[in-house]
Amino acid sequence: MEKTNVLIVDDSSINRELLQYILQDRYQVYQAENGAQAVEMIQSRERIYRLMLLDIQMPVMDGFDVLECLGKKKLLKDLPVIVISGDASNTAVLHAYELGAVDYFSKPFSPEIVLNRVQNILSLYKHEYQDALTGGYNRCGFIRKTENILHNAASAKDY
C-alpha cells in the first residue's frame, strides 16, 4: 500500500528530523526548511501532500504567510495544516485557525500526541478523496490526481 505524503515545514533541522522519525514508519515524509520552499513544493504538484506540519516562526516566509498564501490560491481545501509552534499565545493560535489551520499545538511535543493528531486529521480528510467501499479514488480524488498528472505533463521538458 502506498504511504500518505506528509510535508514537514520547520527551519530547525532538529525538529524536522524528530518529526520525520515519529512519522516515517507510517507516512512518506518530505521536508521544507522554510515557508517559501514549502509553497514551491506544493505549487509544483510534483506530489500530492495529504497533510502539512507547519512551524510559525521561520525566516524567508513564516507560517502565517504560508497559510495566507495557500489560502488565497485555494490550496488549503485539499491540504489540512497542523501548526506546531513554540508560540502558544491565544493570539497566535486564533490567527492560525483564522488563516485555515485545522489544528495547533505547541513545542515541546509528545511523539504520541503528534502521531495521534496526524492520524485523526488524515482520517477526517480521507473521505474527501477516497471511496469508503472500494478504497480507490472517488470523484474528487480522481480529479485531483488527473490535474496533477496533467500539470506535470505540461511542465515536463522531455516529451
Where are each of the predicted segments found?
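Two-component/phosphorelay signaling modules centered on CheY-like receiver
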Residues: 4, 12-31
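Active-site-proximal structural segments of metal-dependent nucleotidyl cyclase/transferase enzymes
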Residues: 143-159
